[in-house]
């Protein structure tokens, strides 16, 4: 179990892990390591064909249960112990694969939500399983929270993503500008009242 990745890349999650049992904390850390590995493959600065090869190899190792890789072994252990659907993990792979193109262009709100579900809603769902959540409404909430966190990350990383030739919200510039103007007017009203 490597908490170092969690501590290095996800400080908030690392500190939150102290409030969990050791077993749950280890499972959360293993899930993080798996997701981080996929994310690192997608964000690698190598040439696209190398990234695609690394992604394909990791996915193949996952599907073939290549337990020579401890990250894959730990992920399969979580899938089995927490009854996580393999489809959820495949959805995660599909989402990450979206980022393995020369140009990433999300063209509709529906596509943006599907992408966000795949790369983050799935993680919320898997975390819920690890945390023993059984309430179906809470599971839906976990998916929605994952999507919301992804949309927040996309909004935060617009410039960085543009440098990587990824445009998730470019088609919504007018909507975003209008929303910001409305928010700013509401803000001004609040401080002047």
Predicted regions and their residues:
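Acidic catalytic motifs of isoprenoid enzymes
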Residues: 1-193
């Amino acid at each position: 179990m490597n908490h170092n990745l969690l501590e290095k890349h996800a400080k908030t999650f690392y500190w939150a892990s102290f409030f969990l049992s050791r077993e749950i904390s280890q499972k959360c850390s293993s899930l993080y390591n798996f997701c981080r590995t996929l994310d690192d493959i997608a964000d690698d600065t190598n040439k696209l064909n190398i990234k695609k090869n690394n992604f394909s190899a990791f996915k193949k190792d996952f599907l073939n249960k290549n337990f020579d890789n401890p990250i894959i072994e730990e992920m399969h252990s979580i899938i089995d112990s927490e009854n996580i659907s393999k489809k959820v993990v495949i959805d995660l792979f599909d989402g990450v694969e979206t980022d393995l193109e020369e140009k990433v262009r999300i063209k509709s709100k529906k596509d943006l939500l599907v992408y966000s579900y795949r790369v983050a809603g799935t993680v919320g769902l898997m975390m819920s399983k690890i945390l023993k959540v059984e309430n179906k409404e809470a599971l839906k909430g976990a998916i929605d929270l994952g999507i919301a966190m992804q949309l927040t990350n996309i909004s935060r990383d617009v410039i960085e993503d543009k440098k990587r030739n990824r445009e998730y919200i470019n088609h919504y510039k007018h909507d975003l500008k209008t929303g910001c103007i409305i928010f700013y007017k509401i803000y001004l009203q609040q401080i002047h009242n």
